[in-house]
Amino acid sequence: MIKQLFWRGLLLALVLVVLYQFWIFMHILWWVEHNPSSSAFMRASLSALQQDNPDAALKHQWVEYQRISIHLKRAVIAAEDAKFVGHEGFDWDGIQKAYEKNWKQGKIVAGGSTISQQLAKNLFLSTKRTPWRKLEEAVITWMLERMMSKRRIFEIYLNVIEWGNGVFGAEAAARHYYRTSASSLNVAQAARLAAMIPNPRYYDKHREARGLIRKARIIEARMRYAEVP
């Protein structure tokens, strides 16, 4: 009896996993041609903001790929994933370097995640670091890379990533920090925004942090070599 219940439970778990993957697959298929209105990360952020202020709202406005500054595209590629155009979702060299760096430090100080992996996490997953989440992130990344063009992946990424406390996407970020549009960002502004991506809420409050300024200068120097889809 116990053995029978075990196998039934296992079968049910497998069915639920398959259904969840199918649900993700259908969302990605829809987003090939349609723009996401929100993401898991955006919903979690809004929920946190509304705990303190029930009337809180996110700053977010979708903008088409061609209306995003080429400087911002180059800056983000240079900062987050220099091999984005060439890899298939995973930068194995980057992952190895991040692992070695984290091992030496004895804690997680580098992620090694590609733009595609970051998008997978932002669209569907929680911020908790668990083996299951990393496995699911890999599966979603694989789906994204095979169902979408690099340009589409990058367009969605630039429109849904967090750029400050309640600030999501390139258009909202450009208006929040520089009172301009995403299409009008110059080289220095783009480099500064790209430098903020790993810790946007902190840099929203510390916009003149030395680390941010130093990183922005490095990104600006690398932008000319960035390959954009």
Curated annotation (Swiss-Prot):
List the membrane topology term(s): Single-pass membrane protein
Task: Give the GO molecular function terms.
Answer: pentosyltransferase activity; peptidoglycan glycosyltransferase activity
**For this UniProt entry, which segments traverse the membrane?**
10-30
- InterPro entries per UniProt: Glyco_trans_51, Lysozyme-like_dom_sf, PBP_transglycosylase, Pep_trsgly
Gene3D superfamilies, A to Z = Biosynthetic peptidoglycan transglycosylase-like
Its GO biological process terms?
Answer: cell wall organization; peptidoglycan biosynthetic process; regulation of cell shape
* Keyword entries, A-Z: Cell inner membrane, Cell membrane, Cell shape, Cell wall biogenesis/degradation, Glycosyltransferase, Membrane, Peptidoglycan synthesis, Transferase, Transmembrane, Transmembrane helix
Pfam families (alphabetical): Transgly
Give an example GO cellular component term for this record.
peptidoglycan-based cell wall
What pathway is this protein said to act in by its record?
Cell wall biogenesis; peptidoglycan biosynthesis
Localisation: Cell inner membrane
- The EC category is transferase
Catalytic reaction equation(s): [GlcNAc-(1->4)-Mur2Ac(oyl-L-Ala-gamma-D-Glu-L-Lys-D-Ala-D-Ala)](n)-di-trans,octa-cis-undecaprenyl diphosphate + beta-D-GlcNAc-(1->4)-Mur2Ac(oyl-L-Ala-gamma-D-Glu-L-Lys-D-Ala-D-Ala)-di-trans,octa-cis-undecaprenyl diphosphate = [GlcNAc-(1->4)-Mur2Ac(oyl-L-Ala-gamma-D-Glu-L-Lys-D-Ala-D-Ala)](n+1)-di-trans,octa-cis-undecaprenyl diphosphate + di-trans,octa-cis-undecaprenyl diphosphate + H(+)
The EC number on file is: 2.4.99.28
The protein's role, per its UniProt record: Peptidoglycan polymerase that catalyzes glycan chain elongation from lipid-linked precursors.
Which protein family is it in?
Answer: Belongs to the glycosyltransferase 51 family.
Q: What is this protein called?
A: Biosynthetic peptidoglycan transglycosylase
Gene label: mtgA
